[in-house]
């Protein structure tokens, strides 16, 4: 009997506890609802005169996860009470501000960021934010992506982006940033992508990226950079892709990218590069793609690619190259035979001569369809008025004289009249009307018919003598000296 009574008492006690907890939860919920009821639901603003209107996937209070907000009517002050209304939708994860009026938003709305404890994606565009102050994003522990295009941002203060431990992407494209100072990006352990395209950046301070150890992609294209040095890229040991297209670089100095140990893709298209130092790409042992299209390169010197042992994509389109010697690409030539390789030389004024004969062999040996297609359409220029012969380089026994020149001229004339008339394209005449250039498909000219420049033949003519030739020269000189001495003595005796 006592046991039954005890069990009954426990059951009543349990029910009482549950009822009490339920009342407390209801009271707590009522209290929260009362708190949120003080704020206007930003997803259901009825006031047409409101400075901000937001459109959400749900207008029910405390349920929206996405909000697309528009700033109207001359803008809104940083301390405007309206910002507190974001408490009505505390679950927002993705927030966008579109500014319709010039000057409508001149700051980063930190009071919104701090209220949204689940915010992951922040996008602001068409504002008039001159400067981003220190800690502008309130040390958020949830922000993953910050996108700020077309906001007229000109200045980034020290630690503008700081202590954002989850941040992985930052985009500042199409602003007016002119320089990057040190410590702008600070304690961002997960930042992987930084987009700074279409600004007016002309100065990278030494170490401006030194805290971005995990960055894998950096876009600096369409800026006004005129020079880059090794110190600009300190800390970017894990960077994989660097885009510096359409800047104003004129040369690449020694070890300019040596801090980028993991770099695999380097884009330098659309600059004004005329010279690359022999160690310009030193240290880029992992580089696989190098794009130098639309520059002003007149030559690619031997040794420039020696450190890039894994390179299999080389884009040299639209430069001023007159030739590309095999020695310049010897270190990566085998890579160009792989399935995914590419070498592109279109848009240069390559001369049709024996210095390009190695491209025939590459065309036959490569497995890459892209390489074959690129080389098949490659044009070169045959100049009918220059002293170019069609002979192979040989060591002539005698110096080149006028008779040899006539022979060269004859063979050149025969070549032009009897071969490849159907391949002739785009005849070009110089201003002096004395020189005609013919564009031809390089691979349609057999290697044995590719002419060699006179200077190459000249250099071959005066190659260093062999040991036998040196020995013979010394012996002949000695005999001549003895004979001269004897003749001189006989002449003296005859006089006496």
What kind of region is each of these model predictions?
Residues 2-496:
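Extracellular leucine-rich repeat
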